[in-house]
Amino acid sequence: MAEPLAVDPTGLSAAAAKLAGLVFPQPPAPIAVSGTDSVVAAINETMPSIESLVSDGLPGVKAALTRTASNMNAAADVYAKTDQSLGTSLSQYAFGSSGEGLAGVASVGGQPSQATQLLSTPVSQVTTQLGETAAELAPRVVAKVPQLVQLAPHAVQMSQNASPIAQTISQTAQQAAQSAQGGSGPMPAQLASAEKPATEQAEPVHEVTNDDQGDQGDVQPAEVVAAARDEGAGASPGQQPGGGVPAQAMDTGAGARPAASPLAAPVDPSTPAPSTTTTL
């Protein structure tokens, strides 16, 4: 069976008085040794550090003991007063008569109102402190509000400037995604050669205009005339025109062509015959 908790305020007060009445001896005088050898020098160097532990720590120990004794006296006083108040409260609820019992019940009913008053006091203090704090912060809030109002248009303008950029980025991303899904993009541009202009490289080889064909037709009859002239110069007198050559060899007709030399280029039949009249 556990023993009931009991505190003896009288014994506690007596122990506190005894602790406070302790008398500590006076610390000895510093030790100093005369001499010049190494032992004397070592003693004079070591002893001050040992003596300082006592001389410096003793006042702190005395102060701690005095404080402990004072706390013990205060605790004994609290225990004594608490015991007295509890005895007085219990004596009010003694059931010696019916009137005393009813009075005790009435007193019990009145305790909640007292407790309410005790609880309401700290709450009112907290409310007052909150009101004072709010009053102190009010000027700062009022000072910050105009700054926020001035910064609001800048924030709206920044958001408006940022929206086109976001749209451009989204469009670029969509185009890149479509190109990736298509699998093939446009052919890359080729660099033009440094030796030929780009116009000559772009022109196909197989394309020949009608003007070029006409030029070729004009050149071929000139070559034929030159070859015939060379043959006439190297032939015998009997074979030159008018020198015994048969008439049918001279007169080939108005629309006939002169005989072509074996060295001359072949003549296209579809090409019209040019005039053979030359000026010497």
Curated annotation (Swiss-Prot):
User: Phosphoserine: which positions carry it?
Assistant: S70
Compartments where found: Secreted
UniProt modification remark: Phosphorylated at Ser-70.
Q: What Gene Ontology cellular component terms go with this record?
A: extracellular region
Q: Which UniProt keywords apply?
A: Phosphoprotein, Secreted, Virulence
Annotated region described as Disordered, given as residue ranges: 167-280
- Secreted keyword on record: yes
Stretches of Low complexity bias are at 167-181, 246-280
What is this protein's function?
Answer: Could be involved in regulation of growth and intracellular survival.
What is the name of the protein in this document? ESX-1 secretion-associated protein EspJ
Taxonomic classification, please?
Answer: Bacteria, Bacillati, Actinomycetota, Actinomycetes, Mycobacteriales
**Gene symbol?**
espJ
